[in-house]
């Protein structure tokens, strides 16, 4: 049996008051590619449409739980199921909202917080390029490092967990964030033992304002949160987020190589402040967009 033949596309029409309950049912039963559509008119009063994909067995479980809500009874909506390989994406066709629902954000964040070999390899490569760029004062190399670094997901994953009130998701995001920062520090530390002096680190720190760096971090976080919640590509904004994590982490690795406690302390403070403010900014941006989505659904 082909993979596509085991997948089911589901179109669920329900009253708005059941949205949160249905979201929990879909989340529990591994549904994905979820979209929430608010049409001008449905077959039931004050109805919304939820579309998603699920494995055939999971789809059956979802239907059984929806029946307990009264789905199929008069005024309580309906569910349509068909093979997923003959359907199209409502979002791609412009039918669905361009903003992600809280449930869509949840599944997006679940992917973001995963620690994979590809992520670790990219962080290592970006760190090596980044420290070379700092040592040689090479701006293009630094920009290349920030484009490679997949650090935006580490920040936004934990921020989404905070907005959705999902403690486990937040913890997973923070673990990935700290792990990636640690990898950057180690990758910067090793070559810095041979090529970096205290004067070089002091030069960069003298050119860095903690206050201005903090402002950049919080703006980058807000922009990233709003872009992700809007369902838009966020790679360009991700470069700004990478600036706020990658460079401070690289500087800390370089400071560690000098064994100067003052430099280590300053770079640690810079990195810690940026990480916290990126998460705060991400929370603000996401909360703003998610709040607007919930307001639309409510009214």
Swiss-Prot record:
It is found in: Cell membrane. InterPro entries: DUF389 (IPR005240). It comes from the Archaea. It holds the Pfam family DUF389. GO terms for cellular component: plasma membrane. The chain crosses the membrane at residues 128-148, 177-197, 210-230, 236-256, 261-281. Coiled coil: none annotated. Keywords: Cell membrane, Membrane, Transmembrane, Transmembrane helix. It is a multi-pass membrane protein. The keyword Transmembrane helix applies. NCBIfam families: TIGR00341 family protein, uncharacterized hydrophobic domain. To M.jannaschii MJ0678. This is Uncharacterized protein MJ1221. It comes from Methanocaldococcus jannaschii (strain ATCC 43067 / DSM 2661 / JAL-1 / JCM 10045 / NBRC 100440).
């Amino acid at each position: 049996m082909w993979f596509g033949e085991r997948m089911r596309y589901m179109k669920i029409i329900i009253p708005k008051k059941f949205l949160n309950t249905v979201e929990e049912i879909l989340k529990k039963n591994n549904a994905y590619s979820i979209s929430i559509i608010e049409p001008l008119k449905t077959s039931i009063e004050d109805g919304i449409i939820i579309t998603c994909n699920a494995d055939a067995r999971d789809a059956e479980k979802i239907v059984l739980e929806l029946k307990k809500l009264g789905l199929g009874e008069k005024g309580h909506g309906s569910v349509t199921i068909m093979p997923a390989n003959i359907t199209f994406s409502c979002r791609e066709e412009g039918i669905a909202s361009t903003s992600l629902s809280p449930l869509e954000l949840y599944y997006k964040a679940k992917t973001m917080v995963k620690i994979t070999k590809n992520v670790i390899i990219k962080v290592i490569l970006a760190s090596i390029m980044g420290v070379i760029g700092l040592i040689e004062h090479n701006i293009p190399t630094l920009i290349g490092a920030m484009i490679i670094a997949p650090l935006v997901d580490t920040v936004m994953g934990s921020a989404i967990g905070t907005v959705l009130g999902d403690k486990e998701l937040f913890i997973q995001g923070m673990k990935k964030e700290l792990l990636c920062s640690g990898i950057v520090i180690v990758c910067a530390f090793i070559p810095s033992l041979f090529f970096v002096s205290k004067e070089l680190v002091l030069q960069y720190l003298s050119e860095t304002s903690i206050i201005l760096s903090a402002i950049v971090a919080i703006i980058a976080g807000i922009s990233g949160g709003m872009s992700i919640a809007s369902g838009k590509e966020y790679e360009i904004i991700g470069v700004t987020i990478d600036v706020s994590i990658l460079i401070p982490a690289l500087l800390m690795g370089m400071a560690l190589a000098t064994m100067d406690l003052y430099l280590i302390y300053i770079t640690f403070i810079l990195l810690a402040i940026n990480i916290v403010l990126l998460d705060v900014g991400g929370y603000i941006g996401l909360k703003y967009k998610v709040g607007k989505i919930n307001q639309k659904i409510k009214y």
